[in-house]
Swiss-Prot record:
Disulfide bonds: none annotated. It catalyses: ATP + H2O + 4 H(+)(in) = ADP + phosphate + 5 H(+)(out). Its main location: membrane. HAMAP family: ATP_synth_alpha_bact. It comes from Thiobacillus denitrificans (strain ATCC 25259 / T1). NCBIfam families: atpA, PRK13343.1. The keyword DNA-binding does not apply. The record marks 373 as: Required for activity. This is ATP synthase subunit alpha. Its EC number is 7.1.2.2. PROSITE patterns: ATPASE_ALPHA_BETA (PS00152).
Amino acid sequence: MQLNPSEISELIKAKIENLGASSELRTQGTIVSVTDGIVRIHGLSDVMSGEMIEMPGNTFGVALNLERDSVGAVILGDYEHIKEGDVAKCTGRILEVPVGRGLLGRVVNSLGQPIDGKGPIAADSSMPIERIAPGVIERKSVDQPVQTGLKSIDAMVPVGRGQRELIIGDRQTGKTAVAIDAIINQKGTGVKCIYVAVGQKASSVANVVRKLEEHGAMEHTIVVAATASDAAAMQYIAPYSGCTMGEYFRDIGEDALIVYDDLTKQAWAYRQVSLLLRRPPGREAYPGDVFYLHSRLLERAARVNADYVEKLTGGAVKGKTGSLTALPIIETQAGDVSAFVPTNVISITDGQIFLETDLFNAGIRPAINAGLSVSRVGGAAQTKVVKKLGGGVRLALAQYRELAAFAQFASDLDEATRKQLERGRRVTELMKQAQYSPMSVSQMALTLFAVNNGYMDEVEVNKILAFEAALQAFMKSKYAAIMDTIETSGNLDGETEKALTAAVEEFKKTGVY
């Protein structure tokens, strides 16, 4: 069969026209070394800081060090299969995590991948883990409370929506217990919770999840877990991932609460990554930007105004403010709050709840030191009735601590001093509260009202908690209407106060405690 040249050229033209070749422009480089979860890559010319880098076996890394002739990246996950000479490619994307309501009730890792065995997550979208915090104009003042359900916190160191309140103390002082109680108390309030576990034992995280499920709190909670067995890079990014998940709710005009448990271990993980990347060490071998590590994270917790929410939702949500409240946890060594990381976080946050080993061992739990604990903005957000009644409690405790030290040396005390000491002992006893038993506003108001007005002055110290429980039960059964009025109004007017006084006096006469 003879083909003339024109037919051959037509066939070639047709083949070229129908060719379905697609070209993709990507920067790729060669892995020069892999050590301790750090890869050095040569040849990535246009890589961004924080960009995801694709490596063999569907493994990703994050570019952190951009040097003259190489890139230093941390590997997210296992790296045993990666070897020198492998190809690494730029993705053009900053690290993102899934966000949305589909994450509620789930346990995920630092990348938002499910680790609870309940199948895939139906996420609304993905958002970068590093985001700029809202500006000054986009914020709104903190004026709504986050009820933790703990008498000692809500009365003395109140937390507002959009606040950053540090929980600080030595190991085994009940820091996590305070945070978990706060999460459990958000049930039914519409506040979504995110619990970020950094560098903890997997068994501890499993216990927390089980307790949240038992108390029906897992329905409004996302757990982000980077356990002690996870790579340092995963522990470093976990708080940022959790923060992004919380910001999703803040930016659609809802309220969220995030617990970072704990940022000391995140700082350790970041120090490890930085030293492996050969960054110059500073104080306590931390890198120079360890303050920025925590400040850029905690500044993202804020109360934002309605204009900001409307702009971000494209007008879909109008007239609603959003908030992200942060409860970072810091572990101290032998009560040393002047160490590098504790001082950094104290200066960034809007107050701190200081937990003491001595108080914990003395059976005062939660072991809150009323003198060192402070809330810089929460007072404006406190429920009116608790604010009205809580001031006396704080004063009684402060005077008691001062007088107790003085009374050790004084042989005979005048009547006024003795009364203050007795009141202080009772208030200290009253601030004790069992774990997983948060109180409502009305229950708290009743307790504070009784102690402020001297109804507990004749009760023996060891019977104070029994008196409180009996009083609560009496009011619930006989005067539920008064309790409902306080709960709904959040205030104590003259008429309600008279009714409450009469009810408490009636209870005292029964003597059933």
